[in-house]
Design a protein with these regions (language model features):
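Charge-dense, helix-prone N-terminal extensions
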Residues: 1-86
Length: 86
């Protein structure tokens, strides 16, 4: 499974825009950092588009090929950001 290229990121444009709106650092397209560490990035594969999100010390993979998967990822991200803000 390879990192998402420009075409894959174009397919995720609304999701990526929502992440940027949350103020996450994006040193390279589609790769987001939090507290100086890689926190979220995307992959593309024959099976679809996926996001790897660091929850705690482990990476977890989420399918983001459709609107439901993208909404689920944003909920997880919002919860994580809210916990960190406390």
């Amino acid at each position: 499974m390879k990192h998402a290229g420009p075409e894959a990121l174009d397919a995720l444009a609304h999701l990526v825009a929502a992440l940027r709106a949350r103020g996450l650092k994006e040193p390279r397209p589609g790769i987001f950092y939090r507290k100086g560490k890689a926190w979220l990035h995307f992959h593309e594969d024959k099976a679809g588009l996926f996001a790897d999100l660091r929850l705690g010390s482990e990476w977890e993979r989420f399918r983001v090929s459709d609107a439901a998967g993208q909404a689920n990822l944003l909920k997880l991200i919002d919860r994580s950001l809210a916990r960190a803000a406390r």
